[in-house]
């Protein structure tokens, strides 16, 4: 029953992020900034704050399970890089990393969580050329997110003392967190697809 409750709460947190994604994707300002190929520093800063806020929200709504917090940080951080590019991914994840490091309820995991949050944003930014303009394949995005979450588990083992604490936590949370977050980012990213479709339609008419 405890495991079912954790999974249900994680699904609710993912649903919250998807709801936010659906809402902000309707704003013309957000559409314009994401569709821009050459963004100004001001535009990148704005997107960094938007996606960084989602990473902070994911930390704040994390589900406590003993010494760790089951969370959805990977969704906002990776989406920042995939949709906004390397700079947006870097600074959005930096905002999230600073927050989790300073305000994490579980200081034993603070360094590992901050490091992995940065990694999520950089990983998304690194794959930005491949995923941009809505041309991504969902199975590739799913596997990329699974890889990111596995790296997160490695960070827990690397930076957490004692190691036994990290290992016990990983055994408890790894499978649901990996699979649900990987599925969640597919729905999150798909919320922005209509922008790219509309842009392609407009270009075909020109």
Positions of predicted regions on the chain:
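Generic transmembrane alpha-helix motif of multi-pass integral membrane proteins
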Residues: 73-89, 123
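Hydrophobic alpha-helical segments embedded in the membrane of multi-pass proteins
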Residues: 53, 70-78, 94
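Interfacial segments of multi-pass membrane proteins
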Residues: 84-85, 99-104
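Membrane-helix interface segments
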Residues: 86-91, 134-138
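Membrane-interface helix-loop junction between the first two transmembrane segments
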Residues: 23-38
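Residue-level recognition of pore/gate-forming positions within transmembrane alpha-helices
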Residues: 55, 96-97, 117, 149
